[in-house]
A protein has these predicted regions:
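Conserved donor NDP-sugar-binding/catalytic core segment of glycosyltransferases
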Residues: 144-182
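Short aromatic/hydrophobic "clamp" motif used to bind/position activated sugar donors
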Residues: 132
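Short, flexible, basic/aromatic active-site loop/helix in glycosyltransferases
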Residues: 184-205
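Glycine-rich, basic loop-to-helix element that forms the pyrophosphate-binding segment
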Residues: 110-127
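Catalytic core of nucleotide-sugar-dependent glycosyltransferases
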Residues: 254-262, 267-289
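N-proximal low-complexity "stem/linker" segments adjacent to membrane-targeting elements
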Residues: 1-67
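Acidic donor-binding loop at a coil-to-helix junction in glycosyltransferase catalytic cores
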Residues: 231-238
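Acidic donor-binding segment of Leloir-type glycosyltransferases
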Residues: 64-108
Length: 289
């Protein structure tokens, strides 16, 4: 059993030490049950959707990717499922993917529940793309999200460092988001997020990696992936780790919708764990500077 909520304060003291978190799940098999890989044309971007017992909102998430318009590069969708099989060797996600029957979608099933963060790691391992676009199984992309991501990744930048992390601007929604375009929302300046900014603001500024946040696969793996020792702030720590060697920037437009609902993050204990984990991250950041 993998526990994503445990906070190891000692690990925070060695935050920049490399830990191979992919090794922690190497004995858990993941089987491809839908889709094909012929190796003829490798995608440039892989959209990953880790999932667990999700139904209707997963359909919305997948459809928001399948309805992308005017994408000038090769891309794929990977759904990686933590849900155990029922008596008929089915899961809600497997049924959905089979019914959609789209060649862009591949479905993988974990033989053991890895938890949310280590399922991100597994999805990144499985991604064929140079860039990995993150999408929660209840969130959505704008209809031109991949087009905007391609534009931003190809924009010439005045930096000697490689871009490693593109943090998606998003809007919150409930119920239905629809097939909306990024141009329906006000343009915003593209921000550079770095470790100095973490000291000033007290956070990375990136938020949860979803709604089109796109990370260089090389950078994700070099950072060691999500580490459950960092508790509920593991995704913020990953962004902070990537900042050390790569540039981290925001998009200049909204490219996705974040579904706001009653969930575990509103639980009192979860909120207290977030506060403690964030305090440990900031203690490390200030100690290093």
């Amino acid at each position: 059993m993998f526990d994503s909520n445990t906070i190891n304060a000692i690990t925070y003291e060695k935050l920049d030490d490399y830990v191979d978190n992919f090794q922690k799940t190497k004995d858990v098999r993941t089987n491809m049950l839908f889709g094909t890989r012929d190796g003829s044309e490798r995608p440039w971007v892989t959209v990953i959707i880790p999932t667990f017992y999700r139904k209707e909102s997963l359909v919305d998430a997948i459809q928001s990717v399948l309805h992308q318009q005017d994408v000038a590069f090769q891309w794929e969708i990977i759904v990686v499922d933590n849900t155990p099989f029922d008596a008929n060797n089915q899961t809600p996600a497997l049924k959905i993917v089979a019914e959609l029957e789209d060649q862009k979608v591949q479905y993988f099933h974990n033989e053991e529940n890895l938890g949310p963060g280590y399922n991100w790691n597994r999805a990144v391992e499985l991604a064929q793309g140079e860039w990995v676009c993150f999408l929660h199984d209840d969130d959505v992309l704008c209809r031109d999200a991949l087009q905007q991501i391609g534009r931003l990744l190809n924009t010439k930048r005045n930096s000697k460092r490689k871009l490693g992390y593109l943090s998606a601007r998003k809007v919150e929604f409930q119920n239905k988001f629809g097939l909306r375009l990024s141009t329906e929302f006000p343009r915003q300046p593209q921000e550079v997020l770095n470790r100095f900014g973490v000291l000033v603001c007290g956070h990375t500024g990136a938020g949860a990696p979803t709604c089109g946040t796109t990370i260089l696969k090389e950078a994700y793996i070099k950072a060691g992936g999500i580490n459950y020792d960092f508790g509920p702030s593991a995704d913020a720590v990953l962004c902070y780790q990537i900042m050390r060697d790569y540039d981290v920037v925001t998009t200049d437009c909204v490219i996705g919708g974040y579904r706001w609902d009653e969930n575990a993050t509103l639980n009192k204990q979860t909120l207290l764990d977030f506060i403690r984990a964030d305090d440990l991250l900031m203690a490390y950041a200030y100690q290093k500077n």
